[in-house]
From Swiss-Prot:
InterPro entries tied to this protein: Homing_endonucl (IPR027434), Sporu_reg_WhiA_N_dom (IPR018478), Sporulation_regulator_WhiA (IPR003802), Sporulation_regulator_WhiA_C (IPR023054), WhiA_LAGLIDADG_dom (IPR039518)
DNA-binding interval(s): 275-308
GO BP annotation list: cell division; regulation of sporulation
Family listed: Belongs to the WhiA family.
Signal peptide: none
PANTHER family listed in its UniProt record: CELL DIVISION PROTEIN WHIA-RELATED (PTHR37307:SF1)
Keywords: Cell cycle, Cell division, DNA-binding
Domain of life according to the entry: Bacteria
Species for this entry: Corynebacterium urealyticum (strain ATCC 43042 / DSM 7109)
GO MF entries: DNA binding
Role noted for this protein: Involved in cell division and chromosome segregation.
Keyword Signal: no
Protein name: Probable cell division protein WhiA
Length: 328
């Protein structure tokens, strides 16, 4: 989890000037790492995090915003804990903090998601909310077969709220439930890179991207080295040819191409040597290989008809021998 620790260390040092953004980060940190307790008729707010920098940042922000001091308890690493945990607790002022961060509504009832003022507020507040959520329960996996940035959430409502915040800043995220735990997952590499940059983890993003590219190069090299089987070579050539034709089809049709066909074509172009089954898994939502093949076939047919009408080169013209040099 070295990358996760690096991200948290980096974004815990990001400077926040606007009180609105500071409040959004605190609200998310408390929502995804916190709990409310009723003690002697008073609400006590508690947050448990895995980083001393995060704990200090949370305490400082709350004191700046609401002028309430916190108590800090450190639980050292032990047999069942690989690292120390930091428990930040507000006994005095807990009710005000819970209300102003949206943990409870005006009637004092617990709220499951994030305040509308954050989701519907400025984009900088949505970025701050993601930063707080990642500091609370985020992980970034090493680039591999399935790279991902994840945030564990206390409820489905909290997960959906984070997905909504991601949508506001151009990040594609999905909810997933595993063994009763709701998670928000970002799997697209471009979205992961964009989110890391937005949150303020540029240095870690560069390291992550370098590792990802290195692994992709190795994977491609290994894949080509194992292309001894003639059927695999033919499949690879067909995939490359289809990608070239799809690229030409999108060029011919321009904005007139139906969205679902355009998405299939773009997948084929972006992943030139992937199998139809792999393309189906990369689609959102996932599709069968037959569905992908059908959409690409309709895209090419539509483009070839348009090319004939316009008397211009069709999609077959894009397939030249130099395309296959990398798969020979």
């Amino acid at each position: 989890m070295a990358l996760t620790a690096d991200v948290k260390d980096e974004i815990a040092r990001v400077s926040v000037v606007r009180a609105e953004d500071m409040n959004a980060e605190v609200a998310a940190l408390l929502r995804y790492s916190g709990a409310l307790h009723l003690v002697a008729g008073q609400i006590v707010v508690e947050s448990e995090v895995d980083s001393s920098a995060t704990a200090r940042r949370l305490m400082e922000f709350v004191e700046q915003l609401y002028h309430h001091e916190a108590q800090l308890q450190i639980i050292g690493a032990g047999n069942l804990r690989k690292s120390a945990r930091y428990i930040v607790k507000w006994i005095k002022g807990g009710t005000e903090i819970a209300r102003r961060t949206g943990l409870i509504d005006r009637a004092g009832r617990p709220v499951q998601g994030l305040p509308r003022t954050i989701i519907g507020g400025p984009k900088s507040a949505c970025v701050a909310a993601w930063r707080g959520a990642f500091l609370a329960r985020g992980t970034l996996t090493e680039p591999g077969r399935s790279c991902a940035l994840e945030v564990a959430t206390p409820s489905n409502e909290a997960a959906l709220a984070l997905v909504g915040a991601g949508r506001r800043i151009g990040v594609t995220a999905k909810t997933r439930e595993t063994r009763g735990v709701h998670r928000v997952v970002v799997k697209d590499a471009e979205s992961i890179s964009a989110l890391l940059t937005l949150m303020g983890a540029q240095a870690t993003r560069l390291v992550w991207e370098e590792r990802r590219m290195r692994r992709e190069v190795r994977a491609t090299a290994n894949r080509l080295a194992n292309f001894d089987d003639a059927n695999l070579r033919r499949s690879a050539r067909a995939a490359v040819a289809a990608a070239a034709r799809a690229d030409r089809a999108l060029e011919i049709l321009g904005e007139d191409v139906p969205t679902h066909l355009a998405e299939a074509g773009q997948l084929r172009v972006k992943h030139r040597q992937a199998s139809l089954e792999e393309l189906g898994q990369l689609a959102s939502p996932p599709m069968t290989k037959d569905a992908v093949a059908g959409r690409i076939r309709r895209l090419l047919s539509m483009a070839d008809k348009r090319a004939e009408e316009l008397d211009i080169p069709d999609t077959h013209a894009a397939v030249t021998e130099d395309l296959f040099q990398d798969v020979e």
